[in-house]
Amino acid sequence: MTTQLATDTELSAVNSILGSIGQSPITQLNLTNLQNPEIALVHNILMEVTKDVQNEGWHFNQEEHIARQPDASGHFTIPSNYLRFDVHDGLYDRTRDVVKRNGKLYDKVTHTDVFSGELYFDITYLFDFEDIPSAIQRYIIARSSVRAATQVVSNQELVQLLQLEEAKTLASAVEYDCEQGDHSFFGFPHESNYRSYQPYKALIR
């Protein structure tokens, strides 16, 4: 009988973390009734690391130049799944300097949270674990395993071994992010086009 491979779920991630610290796997993850304190701790670690990693900002959870309208009272209420919410081109346009205050966007230049019209934003989103790309999932699991080994087992040798795995998965995650983002050191912004010099084209006459 062959084993079918699939991307990670919260259950498989928790089991991977449990396995890394020498604990038995579980068959289901009942989030409304986690009676085992160790399982609850491991799941909490997974959720914390998921937020921490996404807070770093990756190609998969960042979007630029998103148009948003204020509500009827002129406020931009920040949704709970927004990790970062900043005005587009803020590096060049210093007429606005926005921060989160009382759950809404606040302009430190004009000293108000009331806006008169549409603005464009750069947004970093918070996704559920199962909506995260596999390469980033594996990094989250490895990083969570290190934290679990530190908090639950307190075995320094195990922590060091797991840190090696964390470094490998981080390298894979960064490689994935670079390939998906098509990043360039020239710093060309989104919605622009640039074709670099390609030597083979000199042969096309």
Question: What is each of the regions a protein language model found here?
Answer:
Residues M1-R205:
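Glycine-enriched, solvent-exposed interface loops adjoining structured elements
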